[in-house]
């Protein structure tokens, strides 16, 4: 009887942990999609909130950017679409990899770029925030 009770309690704890992590993955995926949408809609308020003040940004050209430099670029963007998202959660840290298709305009004219990216998110005061991001160009 005791063994069955202990097994039942452990099963409930494990199921809760699995569902909890699934919920967190859904929250993180929502942050990633909302961030792409914010770039598309030039929602600087959201971008200021979702990126940590001391975010580490490595561009597809290998440049280190500040949060302010990243947000200044928003006006050039027409759309950002993220796909193939994979999430790994390690406590209050999440690692997201995926593919991004970005279109926009710059001094050279219209562009369309495809990237593989990695975002590192940290859960701060109950909210997921991007603390590091790196992109690698898939265009040859």
Model-derived regions, located:
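Solvent-exposed loop/turn segments at secondary-structure junctions
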Residues: 44, 54-56, 62-64, 101-103, ...
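Short, low-complexity N-terminal intrinsically disordered segments enriched in polar/charged residues
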Residues: 4, 8, 15-49
């Amino acid at each position: 009887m005791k063994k069955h009770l202990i097994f039942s309690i452990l099963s409930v704890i494990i199921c809760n942990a699995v569902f909890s992590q699934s919920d967190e993955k859904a929250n993180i995926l929502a942050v990633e999609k909302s961030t792409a949408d914010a770039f598309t809609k030039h929602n600087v308020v959201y971008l200021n909130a979702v990126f940590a003040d001391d975010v580490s940004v490595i561009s597809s050209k290998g440049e280190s950017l500040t949060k302010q430099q990243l947000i200044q670029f928003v006006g050039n963007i027409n759309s950002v679409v993220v796909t193939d998202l994979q999430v790994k959660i390690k406590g209050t840290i999440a690692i997201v990899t995926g593919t991004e298709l970005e279109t926009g305009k710059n001094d050279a004219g219209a562009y369309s770029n495809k990237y593989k990216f990695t975002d590192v998110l940290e859960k701060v005061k109950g909210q997921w925030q991007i603390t590091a991001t790196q992109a690698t160009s898939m265009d040859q």
